[in-house]
Amino acid sequence: MTTTDRAGLGRQLQMIRGLHWGYGSNGDPYPMLLCGHDDDPQRRYRSMRESGVRRSRTETWVVADHATARQVLDDPAFTRATGRTPEWMRAAGAPPAEWAQPFRDVHAASWEGEVPDVGELAESFAGLLPGAGARLDLVGDFAWQVPVQGMTAVLGAAGVLRGAAWDARVSLDAQLSPQQLAVTEAAVAALPADPALRALFAGAEMTANTVVDAVLAVSAEPGLAERIADDPAAAQRTVAEVLRLHPALHLERRTATAEVRLGEHVIGEGEEVVVVVAAANRDPEVFAEPDRLDVDRPDADRALSAHRGHPGRLEELVTALATAALRAAAKALPGLTPSGPVVRRRRSPVLRGTNRCPVEL
């Protein structure tokens, strides 16, 4: 990040957020989505999916239908590199290099390590949930402990994740959606220099969110927890279906490294394309009853991931950790009930991060 003056950085963050709000208030759904105020963005996702390939006033091309989303994710001409600076950002004196680049570097990073065995992970997670009658915050007391403990096998140092990764958890959101100044500064300070470790930091928040979404989905589906307890393979199918409905990354930013045609539109070299993965994975042209959780879905293999086409094994690691957590918690889930509202993190259009989820066992 080249801006060292706090006042200057704060002005840039506020300027970009204000322009997002202004564009969105005048009918552009993409910048309004970036503001991160929706409790449930599905209505906006449906509208974007039905609009086809569309160029936002932010100069970003937005893709939300399954066929075009898959085309972008599969085309090696689209990468996570940083593209050209939009003219409106340049005119506002707030190029991404001065407020978003550290977070775009996190998004572009990859991890190539060894994924731990799911069965061994599940055994190690067995004591994370307290006994019956306990009240807890599903986020802090369980979901975040999964990557902290699970990635210890990868890093050999849980303390690294316990502190710094929590501060950096906004990184994937901050590459597109300006955060508050103090949050931005804390996140930048927490980011490690090693790209692989940066990827793991991003994976920690992705894992925690997936665990929360999976636990809530299973506890709301009669008989599913018992099925997972009896059949470990059901946990993997459940996590896959939860990730279809609630992807680890709802939005995926790619940059065209060459001129590419998408439908009737030509995307120029250096232009940015955002794939609304969460909309594509509920495309009724592809999935029967797309809004319904169905762990035996015959078309499950058609679900898209934001990591598709990007190198590394981070997605495998996130899936393994979430699957192991579900297996470890399965016997306790039939007795789990919400004891308060789920609090989603604002300014979180990419991750749809969860801040707090009070439950009782």
Curated annotation (Swiss-Prot):
Gene3D superfamilies xref list: Cytochrome P450
Alphabetical GO biological process terms: antibiotic biosynthetic process
TM helices/strands, residue ranges: none
Keywords: Antibiotic biosynthesis
Pathway: Antibiotic biosynthesis; erythromycin biosynthesis
GO molecular function, one term: oxidoreductase activity, acting on paired donors, with incorporation or reduction of molecular oxygen
Top-rank lineage group of the source organism: Bacteria
SUPFAM superfamilies: Cytochrome P450
Family: Belongs to the cytochrome P450 family.
Function: Involved in the erythromycin biosynthesis pathway. Acts by forming a complex and stabilizing the desosaminyl transferase EryCIII.
UniProt cross-references to PANTHER family, sorted A to Z: CYTOCHROME P450 YJIB-RELATED, P450, PUTATIVE (EUROFUNG)-RELATED
Subunit composition and interactions: Heterotetramer composed of EryCII and EryCIII.
Protein name: Cytochrome P450 family protein EryCII
UniProt source species: Saccharopolyspora erythraea (strain ATCC 11635 / DSM 40517 / JCM 4748 / NBRC 13426 / NCIMB 8594 / NRRL 2338)
Annotated gene: eryCII
